[in-house]
Amino acid sequence: MNRVIGVTLAVCFLFLPQTVSAEEPGLITKPSKYSVTKTIKRFESAIQGKGYVIFTEIDHAAAAAKFGLQSLPRTVVVYGDPKNGPARLQQFPTLAIDAPPKALVWQDAQGAVWLTLNSAEYWANHVYKRHGTSASADFIKKLEKDLEEVSDTATK
C-alpha cells in the first residue's frame, strides 16, 4: 500500500512544475480551444485591434529543432504600445530588459493549448517599480481590461 501511495505521489510531483507555472501569481493563463498556431493568430489580431503592434514571434520549438532537439510548441509573441512605450523606455532605459510585453502560447504534455501573459497588477507592482516608474490607476485598469478581452478573444 505504501508503495502505491509513493508511486502515485511521485507521478503527481512529476507533473506539478507545469501546473504550478501555469498558476503563478502575476500571470494570466487561460486554456485555448484552438491550436497553438490559431491561438497566436487570434491573439495577434486581438492585440492589434487594441492599438498595439507585433514586433516578433519567437518559436522555441523551431529553435530547438535546429539543434536536433524536440520540444512541445512554445511561441512567444512580443508586442507593444507605440503610443506609450517609446517615451517610457526613453525615460527609464532599464525598463527595456522587461519590455516590450510578451505573450506565450504553449502546448502541454497532454496536448492542451494555453495562453500566458503577465498581469496588469504584475506590471504595476513589480516591473514598473523595479525600474523606478509607475503607472496611473486608470492606465492599469485599462491594461487589465485590454488583457482580459484580448486573452478571451484569443482562447474562446
Positions of PLM-derived features:
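Compact, glycine-rich, soluble single-domain proteins
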Residues: 48, 59-101, 105
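Bacterial N-terminal signal peptides
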Residues: 6-17
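Soluble non-cytosolic domains of exported or imported proteins
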Residues: 30-38, 55, 134-141
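Terminal, regulation- and interaction-focused segments at domain boundaries
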Residues: 22-51, 152-156
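C-terminal partner/receptor-binding element of secreted or periplasmic proteins
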Residues: 121-156
